[in-house]
Amino acid sequence: MARNKSRRLLWAVCLAALAAFAAAMVWLHYQQLCSPGGGSDPYTSDLGMHLAFAQRGMVYSTVSLLIGPAYALAGRIGIAVLLAAFHLAAVAVFACGLRTALPDAPRPARLLVSLVVNLATAVWMPRGGYWYQGTVGGTIYHNTTYIMLAPFALLAMLAFYRVWPTMRDDLDLRSYAVYTVLLTVATSFKASLIFAFAPALLVLLIADFVRTRAKNLKNEIIMGCSVFPGVALCFIQANVLFAEEGSGIRLIFTVPFGHHRMLWGPFNEAGVLGLARSFVFVAAVGLLLGRAAWQRFRYRFSLFTFAVSLAEALLLVESGERLYHANLWWGPFICFWVFWLESVSVFLQQTRTGAAPRWRLAVCAAALAWHIVSGVCFLVMLLQGVSYNVPILTYNLW
């Protein structure tokens, strides 16, 4: 009886927290949709621009097909509710990903942990640059396509983790089909994941080819074909997004530096500090819990995929009229979120088993708490009408 009462109480707390989060997302996104945009309004975001694209009939992703009917059904509040549902879906999928780290934890407990760790953003520190510009984080509140991509991208990665171990013997075709469909659906929202995942998978398949001495070629070819539907969608999207003459993707070294001052990356102080502020927790896990982390294929592959995405963002740039859009940086954001899941999983697993020294766990816990508190402050600022791209007040103080 007492156990059932505790379980019901846990569910009540979980549902109340999720409801509060959903309400905050609906209110924030409604304000963003009412914003005139242009960067000067405190609630400026990409939401209004994507709505305008859909209203003009510019269809380049599944997002365009969803926000139009949502707007026709209930106006801006309809889109806000739709985005809140995707936020909740991302929290739920992240909670599913935590199952390996918390196998005995009840579902509401995993949902609460997922919600809390997904509030995290780059840590705040004096003279730390911008709250957003220059940072890499997994949870985004101002971009329609990313918000809708997130749950499907993580579902695709979790499905990949399930099918990959079957490569050595008989490939599980049912799991393979589910993974391929999810990867394709994720790409239909935004190509950010597959743009890094496909090269990372290619390297993985080449390594498997060498290791098995070409004895697993059939499975390797089948697995490689899983990205083809998504890549085909990338070409369709590119025909819409890069329709202007001179638009495309080029190496950053071929673009005159004076015409493209990087918003992110190592070319300015805010970018360098932003990257440093983004990786406090994952660096702590990698350095202090590295042995346990590197034993997990999911951790190694998610880190490699993130490294590929970061290299692409630093070395490639959109050209033509999309020069300053910096859309290639959505790749590191979504891949970091996948890597964030594995870093959190390693930390929780080591905490549950007590396998690591307590001081190492304490350092990692402090780093995670720093991220979460910073993220809560950032979200409160957004709700209060402080634009996400406004520099923090202490930037030029010291």
Q: Can you say where each PLM-predicted feature lies in the sequence?
A:
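Transmembrane-helix motifs of polytopic, lipid-linked glycan transferases
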Residues: 81-108, 155
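Start-transfer (signal-anchor) and selected internal transmembrane alpha helices
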Residues: 1-28, 105-114
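Perimembrane helix-loop-helix junctions
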Residues: 197-228
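Short hydrophobic/aromatic helix or loop-helix immediately within or flanking a transmembrane segment
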Residues: 46-78, 84
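Membrane-interface alpha helices of multi-pass inner-membrane proteins
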Residues: 175-191, 197, 202
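Membrane-interfacial loop-to-transmembrane alpha-helix junctions, especially the N-terminal start
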Residues: 10-14, 106-113, 171-175, 217-224, ...
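Membrane-interface micro-motifs in multi-pass membrane enzymes
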Residues: 109-161, 326-336
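Transmembrane helical bundles and short interhelical boundary loops of multi-pass, membrane-embedded
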Residues: 227, 231, 242-398
